[in-house]
């Protein structure tokens, strides 16, 4: 009886696997036009260097590529003009002087054809871009960043020395 149950279960799993191997593995899993919002979705997955624009059916409309030595810095926005503004960081960050949650390093503007129009890097011993940024109506970018303050400066500004971890303070700045 146990063999019959095992065989039946194995057959069901095999059939389910065959059905899944033919389904779309990227994009939309379920689509109800009555519940969907018109437009596209920008996807910038963590630890993958590319950003994808998909339609409501999950079909890829456009891809912006980055080299394999880069990883997302947690933010990407599409402008009304079709420019992609995204943040990224080196894939290997262990040697970076500042590393904390939400770490970025570069904010970059790219055209629809993936040409870099501009970039801004903050990733040194005094500061590192944080996880997000905002585009203003004037076309400028506001970004939050980690700021390293050494113990002498922190104490001079009123910080309790007992609360300084590793002899420094990480603050934030715009």
Predicted regions and their residues:
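Bacterial N-terminal signal peptides
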Residues: 7-17
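Histidine-/acidic-rich catalytic cores in large beta-rich domains
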Residues: 20-174
């Amino acid at each position: 009886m146990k063999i019959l149950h095992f065989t039946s279960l194995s057959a069901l799993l095999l059939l389910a696997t065959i059905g899944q191997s033919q389904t779309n593995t990227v994009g939309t899993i379920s689509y109800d036009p009555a519940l969907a919002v018109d437009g596209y979705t920008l996807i910038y997955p963590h630890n993958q260097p590319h950003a994808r624009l998909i339609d409501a059916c999950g079909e890829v409309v456009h891809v912006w590529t980055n080299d394999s030595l880069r990883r997302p810095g947690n933010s990407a926005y599409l402008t009304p003009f079709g420019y992609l503004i995204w943040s990224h960081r080196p894939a290997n960050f262990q040697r970076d002087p500042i590393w904390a949650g939400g770490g970025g390093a570069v904010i970059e503007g790219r055209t629809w054809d993936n040409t870099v129009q501009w970039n801004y890097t903050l990733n040194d011993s005094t500061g590192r871009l944080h996880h997000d940024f905002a585009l203003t109506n004037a076309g400028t970018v506001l970004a939050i960043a980690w700021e390293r303050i050494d113990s002498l400066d922190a104490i001079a500004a009123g910080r309790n020395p007992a609360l300084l971890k590793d002899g420094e303070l990480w603050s934030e700045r715009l």
